[in-house]
């Protein structure tokens, strides 16, 4: 992440392209795409939120709460590179969670052993996408607003109060 916080920085296009591809698309974009695509593949009679069971996601919630404290602290200290890095860590956490849960293996038969935990993780992935829309808003305002709408949220993301705290509960 190249930002002039404490000193000048050198900008070059190859580094910019590599960072966009390696960080934004590979971590953030991939995670959001996976959650939205897998959620869309569910039967219409079974919405994603019906699988929510946070008891399966305590480890992820703990990690996300820690990242939230770090993101908030970084933003309060005007350490934007650091805050962005922690936000990207939340996207990586989501990717790892989905990779381990393999919810795509249960989409055709939601009664299989292990499907309840796996689908609970996918449902938590939706919460995490909502959290990413909120925390990435200072860095990607237009994309965050688009994601906010794709998640079915009403109103303008910028004027949503305490939205990040709501995601963690």
Q: Where are each of the predicted segments found?
A:
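Conserved, charged catalytic cores of large soluble enzymes
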Residues: 32-71, 91, 95-115
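Short coil/turn segments at secondary-structure boundaries
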Residues: 1, 8-12, 85-86, 140-142, ...
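Basic, alpha-helical terminal appendages of large translation-related enzymes
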Residues: 73, 77-79, 88-161
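Short hydrophobic "helix-edge" motifs at membrane interfaces and signal-peptide entry regions
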Residues: 2, 67-69, 130-132
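Extended, non-catalytic structural segments that build the interaction scaffolds
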Residues: 11-24, 66-85
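Single conserved hydrophobic/aromatic residue that forms the stacking wall/gate
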Residues: 159-169
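Catalytic adenosine-cofactor/nucleotide-binding cores of aminoacyl-tRNA synthetases and other
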Residues: 1-53, 154-158
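Amphipathic alpha-helix face/heptad-repeat signature
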Residues: 20, 24-27, 31, 56, ...
């Amino acid at each position: 992440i190249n930002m002039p916080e404490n000193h000048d920085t050198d900008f070059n296009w190859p580094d910019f392209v590599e960072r966009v591809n390696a960080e934004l698309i590979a971590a953030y974009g991939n995670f959001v795409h996976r959650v939205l695509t897998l959620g869309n593949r569910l039967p219409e009679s079974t919405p994603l939120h019906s699988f929510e069971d946070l008891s399966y996601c305590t480890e992820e919630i703990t990690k996300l709460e820690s990242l939230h404290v770090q993101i908030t602290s970084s933003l309060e200290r005007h350490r934007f590179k650091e805050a962005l890095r922690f936000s990207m860590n939340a996207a990586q956490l989501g990717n790892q969670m989905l990779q381990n849960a393999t919810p795509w293996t249960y989409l055709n038969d939601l009664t299989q052993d292990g499907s309840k935990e796996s689908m609970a993780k996918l449902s938590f992935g939706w919460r995490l996408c909502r959290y990413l829309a909120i925390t990435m808003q200072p860095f990607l305002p237009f994309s965050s607003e688009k994601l906010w709408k794709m998640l079915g949220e009403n109103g303008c993301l910028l004027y949503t109060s305490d939205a990040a705290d709501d995601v963690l509960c």
